[in-house]
């Protein structure tokens, strides 16, 4: 059976891994998942990620903790296959008053809500991370 929403699966694996205090989580790799992992690393929500080149590429995300607590408090899918959510540059949400990020898929690639506002572009809101 095929996976209906691979991005939601990725976010759930991260959420469950941190709830169980795992060091890392593994999942099937895809270009969009790697781009999301890169954004999460750049913003300091995860320690790192690696893509294993095998017959079926696998993405391993190393989770980050601070004083024994997960750095990611909430990670929530917004736009999904059954209901796409698009926002213009002026409508992009500020997650937790600017403490969190919204990952946005724009015509210029995947970026945070702050970067999208600076570039003056809107797009599909993939998820919220705080």
Swiss-Prot record:
Query: Does the UniProt entry include the keyword Ribosomal protein?
Result: yes
Task: Give the record's GO CC terms.
Answer: ribonucleoprotein complex; ribosome
Concerning its family, UniProt says:
Belongs to the universal ribosomal protein uS8 family.
PROSITE patterns per the UniProt record, alphabetical: RIBOSOMAL_S8 (PS00053)
Which Gene3D superfamilies does the UniProt entry name for this protein?
3.30.1370.30, 3.30.1490.10
Q: Pfam families from the entry?
A: Ribosomal_S8
What protein am I looking at? Small ribosomal subunit protein uS8
Q: Name one GO molecular function term.
A: structural constituent of ribosome
The UniProt entry, under NCBIfam families, shows: PRK00136.1
Query: What does this protein's UniProt record list under function?
Result: One of the primary rRNA binding proteins, it binds directly to 16S rRNA central domain where it helps coordinate assembly of the platform of the 30S subunit.
| InterPro entries documented for this protein | Ribosomal_uS8, Ribosomal_uS8_CS, Ribosomal_uS8_sf
The entry describes its oligomerization and partners as: Part of the 30S ribosomal subunit. Contacts proteins S5 and S12.
Which Gene Ontology BP terms does the record give?
translation
Q: Which domain of life is it from?
A: Bacteria
Can the keyword RNA-binding be found in this entry's annotation? yes
Q: Which UniProt keywords apply?
A: Ribonucleoprotein, Ribosomal protein, RNA-binding, rRNA-binding
């Amino acid at each position: 059976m095929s996976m209906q929403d691979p991005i939601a699966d990725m976010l759930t694996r991260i959420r469950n891994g941190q709830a169980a205090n795992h060091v890392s989580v593994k999942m099937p790799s895809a270009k969009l998942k790697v781009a999301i992992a890169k954004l999460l690393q750049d913003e300091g929500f995860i320690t790192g990620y690696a893509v294993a080149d095998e017959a079926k590429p696998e993405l391993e995300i190393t989770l980050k903790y601070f004083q024994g607590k997960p750095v990611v408090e909430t990670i929530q899918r917004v736009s999904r296959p059954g209901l796409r959510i698009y926002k213009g540059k002026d409508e992009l949400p500020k997650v937790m008053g600017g403490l969190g990020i919204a990952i946005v898929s724009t015509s210029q690639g995947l970026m945070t809500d702050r970067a999208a506002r600076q570039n003056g572009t809107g797009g599909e809101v993939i998820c919220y991370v705080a």
